[in-house]
From Swiss-Prot:
Subunit composition and interactions: Forms a tight 1:1 complex with EsxH.
Cysteine disulfide partners in this protein: none
The family this protein is said to belong to: Belongs to the WXG100 family. CFP-10 subfamily.
Protein name listed in UniProt: ESAT-6-like protein EsxG
Keywords in alphabetical order: Secreted
Any one cellular-component term (Gene Ontology): extracellular region
InterPro entries xref list: ESAT-6-like_sf
Membrane-crossing segments per the record: none
Entry's localization field: Secreted
Length: 97
């Protein structure tokens, strides 16, 4: 029995919604990388070297963004499950009103 006023279904829905938004972000990053790879052939000489350096940095940063999205989604899920578990465990210690 929960005595605290928390909207658990909202926490669960937030995790699912965040997952959908994270998937959209990942898709956008993948599309940007595909567009960059398609335009790579147009660069020559110094422009080609600059493009390759910028693209390498983009790939590095996009990997970090994806990792942060994974961590954020896990944290939202953990918040809901740990809240429910701790609240249920503490509910037995409450005395009747």
């Amino acid at each position: 029995m929960s005595l605290l006023d928390a909207h658990i279904p909202q926490l669960i829905a937030s995790e699912a919604n965040f997952g959908a938004k994270a998937a959209l972000m990942r898709s956008t990053i993948a599309q940007a990388e595909q567009a960059a790879m398609s335009s790579q052939a147009f660069h020559m000489g110094e422009a080609s070297a600059a493009f390759q350096a910028a693209h390498a940095r983009f790939v590095e940063v996009s990997a970090k963004v994806n990792a942060l999205l994974d961590i954020a989604q896990l944290n939202i899920g953990d918040a809901a499950s740990s809240y429910v578990a701790q609240d249920a465990a503490a509910a037995s210690t409450y005395t009747g009103i």
